[in-house]
């Protein structure tokens, strides 16, 4: 069930996705594998979270193991645009970049912006 929160001029769309436990497990294993294959280990300090976009893994949407996730996200985007009365049939929608992050207890992700994107999405595969 989706919800929209309006914080003028920002609208936030929240929804639950229906991924199976096996799908989630497979994606978590894939992210852990990416972490082990990191290409830029000097970038990560003890207080910073691992971010796939800095390690050569910035195109999750092209990874077959994440296919169903991105199909569902795309459907949510269409619902969000419909709720704003935006005719998405007149738009070309595409995923530009997508990556996983791993944040351990004392780690954080620095403040940042996604200025190149019209929409930004966060999905929590596993939250502890």
Residue ranges and their predicted role:
Residues 86, 94-128:
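Catalytic core of non-heme Fe(II) oxygenases with the double-stranded beta-helix
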Residues 1-87, 108:
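Non-heme Fe(II)/2-oxoglutarate
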